[in-house]
């Protein structure tokens, strides 16, 4: 059962996912990571914990969303390898980043999925493609 979800990157897609996840009946705890301290506005949302760096709480998540820019992946991947649970599913929302690049960046230690969606996810009307 999914209880904890981590989202790395706090941009528009992350905001959409948070808003939609909080509308479901499931009681998810969401760990949100972003280096920009201005994104701490999410801390006022129930069940959302904001951190400026990836930490040990990543290992408690069953699903990890990568909602970052592709050029940041090489830095983030090191923290995922260090703190992530190898049983977690890592779902990449990074535009233009092939699945084999993600697998290699994570040392092929995680179950990885590439997902393409759009901003309509905030309304529950997005078309999403999963690889």
State where each predicted segment sits:
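NAD(P)+-binding Rossmann beta1-loop-alpha1 motif at the extreme N-terminus of oxidoreductases
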Residues: 1-52, 56, 125
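Rossmann-like NAD(P)(H) cofactor-binding subdomain of soluble oxidoreductases
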Residues: 17, 42, 54-59, 63-130
């Amino acid at each position: 059962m999914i209880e904890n979800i981590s989202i790395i990157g706090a941009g528009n897609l992350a905001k959409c996912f948070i808003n939609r996840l909080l509308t479901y009946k499931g009681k998810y705890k969401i760990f949100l990571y972003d280096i920009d301290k201005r994104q701490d506005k999410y801390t006022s949302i129930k069940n959302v914990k904001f951190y400026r760096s990836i930490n040990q709480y990543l290992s408690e998540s069953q699903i990890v969303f990568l909602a970052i820019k592709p050029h940041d992946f090489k830095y983030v991947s090191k923290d995922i390898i260090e703190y992530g649970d190898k049983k977690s599913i890592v779902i990449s929302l990074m535009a233009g980043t092939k699945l084999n690049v993600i697998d290699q960046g994570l040392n092929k230690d995680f179950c990885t999925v590439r997902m393409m969606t759009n901003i309509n996810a905030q309304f529950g009307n997005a078309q999403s493609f999963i690889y």
